Amino acid sequence: MTISKRDNVCLQAAGLATATTAAQVRTVNAIGYTINGRTYAKAATDNLWAPAGAVMAAGEVQVIWLYLNAAGTASVEASAVKKASTTTSTTERYTGGAFDWPDPVDKCCVGAMVITATGAFTPGTTSTATQCVFVNAGPDYGAPITY
């Protein structure tokens, strides 16, 4: 049997948000999730994920995927940094791209933190409150995350 991301899913929106420690991420809601056909639960938790990724400059975009394993332990995975245009010219304007949802093994993707840097941004150090958008995974990952 082949396991795919549809077998490791988050069953409810976690309500991802900036944590009390402003450079971290929390869940506002309790969630259920599955890994390899088994169901697990995680209570709403503050300071759950400490983002890690590349230091970014203004005009760069990166996604940090937020995972839980069967023990409820949090981990992260950063995408490659992509460039976004800062031009206002309609003829040179950047056409947005997309990040595909990951296909994790032995863990569940609870959501993503999309960073669109308007200035220097260091994951795990810079507050997630200003340059980040949280995307909650649900029963079906659906369309790629666009930027």
What are the residue ranges of the model-derived segments?
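Beta-strand-rich solenoidal segments
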Residues: 1-147
